[in-house]
Amino acid sequence: MNNILSFDIDEIRDILRGWGEPSYRADQIFDWVYKKLILNPSSMTNLPKGLRQKIAEYFSFDIPKVVKITGEGNTKKYLLELEDGENIETVLISHKNRNTVCVSVQVGCAIGCKFCATGLVGLRRNLNTHEIVGQIILIQKELFEKGDRISNVVYMGMGEPLLNYDNVVKSIRIINREWGLNIGSKHITLSTIGIVPKIYQLGEEDLKVRLAISLHAPNNELRSKIIPINKEYPIEKLLESAFYYAEKTGRRVTFEYVLIKNFNDREEHAIELAGLLKNKPVHVNLIPWNKVPEYPWETSDLKDIFKFKKILSDAGINVTLRISYGSRIKAGCGQLRALYLKSKGELK
């Protein structure tokens, strides 16, 4: 069955016209789905009864099912189950009157970064558009009942967004457009490990979302040790694509940098990173490593973290130290799913 959350409004209009219905019915349907968050056609009372029945027969309105919720302070992590029984994770961070949802785009991940829990079991499959949008609708419904709503969406959960390009871009359009969830493009961030051709392609879209790039090292030798795909898309090519995106969209690019003790957190690494990014339209997010038992790394010492940050700041680079809100609830990417798979005997 066709899930309603996979369609944009023009596609719904075309279907309705094929049924002999006026196209404005699409606006009414989407008002119920995205504004009132009603996922039951029988409750769409301004539609003719016959049309409601036809919609129910043609479309499904399913969203992912909640398996488990863990919470710590202002962070909630949702372990979700999809229709085929696969599991993904979604995180809600509520902070200073903002509600940020972190969504997954794949079941697992094929990149195999040597510090990330998501890639431990590889890639199962891409998420469909409705499975991405469904995560956001799930959280929006929960907040809506409290008189609140989502303010930001970040594509930073499980999987590499640019390796599920079409479904991710369509989901962004659905949540961004006025007929959808109407979340502004400056409040949507896509995070990528650095799939260079797709960064250029994204720059040509009419989206202008914020771009975050997982850099994690100041040179190719170090980066290739923890990010295998760096051998295909080395840092110099990655930076070229990032600066192109910034110029094309007018959006400053964020570089994510996970600090790993005695690997990429030394003074010389900070100086080298500053040399790459100085006088560029960028922001750097420093992230203390969130421990994953399967990897040997340790979190950097605080004194080294602050020294690293100061070197970047002194070079005139905008830099933020990201607080790890979800470390105790295993809210690092893929950690809750990994624990769940272990409990089922699917991960050693």
Swiss-Prot record:
It catalyses: adenosine(2503) in 23S rRNA + 2 reduced [2Fe-2S]-[ferredoxin] + 2 S-adenosyl-L-methionine = 2-methyladenosine(2503) in 23S rRNA + 5'-deoxyadenosine + L-methionine + 2 oxidized [2Fe-2S]-[ferredoxin] + S-adenosyl-L-homocysteine; adenosine(37) in tRNA + 2 reduced [2Fe-2S]-[ferredoxin] + 2 S-adenosyl-L-methionine = 2-methyladenosine(37) in tRNA + 5'-deoxyadenosine + L-methionine + 2 oxidized [2Fe-2S]-[ferredoxin] + S-adenosyl-L-homocysteine. Its cofactor is [4Fe-4S] cluster. This is Probable dual-specificity RNA methyltransferase RlmN. It is an enzyme of class 2 (transferase). Specifically methylates position 2 of adenine 2503 in 23S rRNA and position 2 of adenine 37 in tRNAs. Keywords: 4Fe-4S, Cytoplasm, Disulfide bond, Iron, Iron-sulfur, Metal-binding, Methyltransferase, rRNA processing, S-adenosyl-L-methionine, Transferase, tRNA processing. It comes from Dictyoglomus thermophilum (strain ATCC 35947 / DSM 3960 / H-6-12). The gene is rlmN. GO terms for biological process: rRNA base methylation; tRNA methylation. It is found in: Cytoplasm. Residues 95-328 form the Radical SAM core domain.
